[in-house]
C-alpha cells in the first residue's frame, strides 16, 4: 500500500463498481489519488477492481476494494476502521451511490422514450415551477413504498450516514472534500410541493432537521397515498425528493464545516443504469465533474450546486 504522506490524497467512492462511480475511481487514481472503490455487491466490486487494474495498469498502490452497504451503519463503521488503520485520515469522500426508486415494467424501449422526452425538459434552465407538463406517471415504470423508501434511504440518508461517519477522518486532512452526486431532477422547480420548496429554498434558516422534516413528510404522504393531493411531483417522485434533499443538505454541511470544500453536482445526462442507459454523455464525461470538485483548491467554492463544471441554480 502507498506510503502515508501529507502529499498523498486518499479517497472513498461509493457505488464505484460501475458507471460514473467506476470512471471516477479511474480518473482519481490516474491523478495520483489512492482510491478505495466501494460497492454493496462484493463480487461486482472485486471484478471492477480487476478491470481497472487490467485497463489502466493500476496496482494495490493506486486502488483497492472494500465492500460497503451505505444503508448499514455496521458496514460503514467497518470501512471507517479500514481507512483509519491504513491511511490515518480521509481527504476525499464522493457520495455517488444512488438508485432511481422505480422498477422497469414491460418494454424497456418505451421507458427510454419516456425518459428522453422528460429529461429534455428537466435539463433546461427554464425555472417555471412546473413539471414540464408531466401530470401523470407514464408507462414503463412502477414504484411502491419499498422502492420509495429504499431510494430515500440510499440517495439521501446513505450519503448522510457516510458523511457523518467520515467527518472525524476528513477533519484530519489539510484539504477535505465532499462531493455529493445529485441531479438536475432535484431542482426545486420540479419538487412541486410549495411547502417543501419554501423550506429548502430558505438557505439562511435551513438546518439538517428541516431537510429531514421534508423527507419525512414526503414519506408520510406517500404512505397515506396523498402525494398527488399534497402537490408532490408525479414522476420519479422519490428520486426528485431524495436529490433535492441532498442538495439542501450539502448547503447545511458547507456552512457547518467552513474549512471543507463541500459541493453537490449533477454530472449531466449520462448513460447509466438509473436511466436505462438513455443518456447523451458517457460515464467518463460525467465523472469529470466529480473529479473536478474532488480536487478543488483550498480557496475553491463550497456549498454550491453544479451542473457538470458550472454553478447552476437550485
UniProtKB/Swiss-Prot annotation:
Catalytic activity: (+)-neomenthol + NADP(+) = (1R,4S)-menthone + NADPH + H(+)
Any GO BP: defense response
Tissues and organs where the protein is expressed, per its UniProt entry: Expressed in flowers and red fruit tissues. Not detected in leaves, stems, roots or green fruits.
Single GO MF descriptor: (+)-neomenthol dehydrogenase activity
Catalytic residues of the enzyme: 239
Induction of expression: Strongly induced by inoculation with an avirulent strain of pathogen, but not with a virulent strain. Induced by salicylic acid, ethylene, abscisic acid and drought. Not induced by cold, wounding or H(2)O(2).
Keyword NADP: yes
UniProt keyword terms in alphabetical order: NADP, Oxidoreductase, Plant defense
Residue positions binding NADP(+): 13-36
pH-activity relationship: Optimum pH is 9.0 for the forward reaction and 7.5 for the reverse reaction.
Residues annotated to bind substrate: 183
Family: Belongs to the short-chain dehydrogenases/reductases (SDR) family.
Function according to Swiss-Prot or TrEMBL: Involved in basal resistance against pathogens.
PANTHER family per the UniProt record, alphabetical: (+)-NEOMENTHOL DEHYDROGENASE, (+)-NEOMENTHOL DEHYDROGENASE-LIKE
Name of this chain's protein: (+)-neomenthol dehydrogenase
Organism: Capsicum annuum
Gene: MNR1
